[in-house]
Design a protein with these regions (language model features):
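Histidine-acidic metal/acid-base catalytic patches
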Residues: 1-12, 16-27, 47, 98-100, ...
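Residues at the starts of beta-strands that form the adenosine-phosphate
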Residues: 3, 59, 143-144
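Short beta-strands and strand-loop turn motifs
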Residues: 5-8, 34-35, 64, 104-105, ...
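A short, flexible beta-alpha/helix-coil linker loop
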Residues: 11, 68-70, 109-111, 151-152, ...
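Short N-terminal micro-motifs specific to bacterial/archaeal maturation
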Residues: 13, 40, 71-74, 117, ...
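Structural motif corresponding to the early beta-alpha repeats
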Residues: 32, 36-127, 237, 241-251, ...
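Active-site acidic/histidine proton-transfer and metal-coordination neighborhood
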Residues: 55, 78-177, 187, 260, ...
Length: 284
């Protein structure tokens, strides 16, 4: 049985207490998991969200992106320290929520491109930071921190599953795994099956389901049947979350270079995408 989820990005750019209505809405639409974006964990309405997800009966998962102010591969040690502090606070939020997974760009500042390939020093800084955060998480709960491989236009640090698995192994705490996103995979991987098998059950921690153009899943170029077959083959049973963005967003759509509408609303995209993906999954 597949655990299909949906991202809060379908409805809002920055989840806050005014967005609590999204939690029952996601459940009503047939999703089992809600992927909640948190960039500022220190101001996140943790208690309110915890109460609402418990009331509704939906599984909470969080994602984040480090920023230029919390970039753990920055040459500035103060910025690296701020990144570790922010990630530890995010761990605290997840533990209180009862979330079992953190996803996203947890290893470097999102969009903080150096203009050259990743360096060994950057690798060392990131691994050291992640090891500290992951050990902190391990001491508190069974929370898994995942590292999302994103395309070359968004990060120079982790673009493919092979590097992400090597990163997880080097961190070495056992609770750091790989977050695969089909939008990024179709740009960077040579094979969906190969990427999934590279991670295997041991290192595959989280999945985002996005069409190649950020449109309605099942209407583009992503080889969904191959992807689902590979996931089934390695025994992945975790959340599989539809992520896209409402066409009315301004800042997020600018950052993600989304210039046209793919559906009347983000919700319409998610609902049709869920229907398409369930039909494909039923054939696997």
């Amino acid at each position: 049985m597949y655990n299909f989820g949906v991202s809060t990005f379908i409805w809002t750019e920055n989840f806050s207490v005014k967005d609590l209505w999204i939690i029952p809405k996601a459940k009503d639409l047939g999703f089992e998991t809600l992927d909640i974006f948190i960039v500022h964990p220190e101001t996140f309405p943790t208690a309110e969200v915890k109460a609402k997800v418990a009331e509704v009966g939906i599984e909470p998962v969080t994602i984040t992106t480090l920023t230029k102010e919390t970039n753990v591969i920055s040459p500035d040690p103060n910025i690296r320290a701020a990144g570790v502090k922010s990630l530890k606070k995010l761990v605290d939020v997840n533990v209180e929520l009862g979330s079992k997974i953190i996803g996203g760009v947890t290893y470097a500042g999102w969009g903080c491109l150096s203009g050259k390939p990743r360096t060994e020093q950057e690798w060392e800084w990131s691994v050291t930071a992640m090891r500290e955060v992951a050990q902190y998480a391990k001491n508190k709960s069974d929370l898994v921190i995942t590292v999302e491989t994103v395309n070359r236009f968004e990060s120079h640090f982790l673009n493919i599953a092979e590097d992400a698995v090597r990163y997880c192994k080097q961190v070495g705490t056992g609770n750091v795994k790989v977050h695969l996103d089909s939008f990024h995979m179709i740009r960077e991987e040579t094979s969906f099956t190969g990427a999934v098998n590279t991670c295997g059950k041991e290192y595959l921690g989280y999945i985002h389901l996005c069409e190649n153009n950020r449109g309605i899943p099942g209407t583009g170029l992503v080889p969904w049947k191959e992807f689902f077959t590979a996931l089934k083959g390695v025994g992945y049973t975790g959340p599989m979350v539809i992520e896209s963005f409402d066409p009315g967003f301004e800042e997020l759509n600018r950052l993600c270079a989304i210039w046209r509408k793919f559906a009347d609303s983000g919700e319409a995209l998610a609902v049709e995408g869920l229907r398409n993906l369930k039909a494909i999954a039923a054939e696997v």
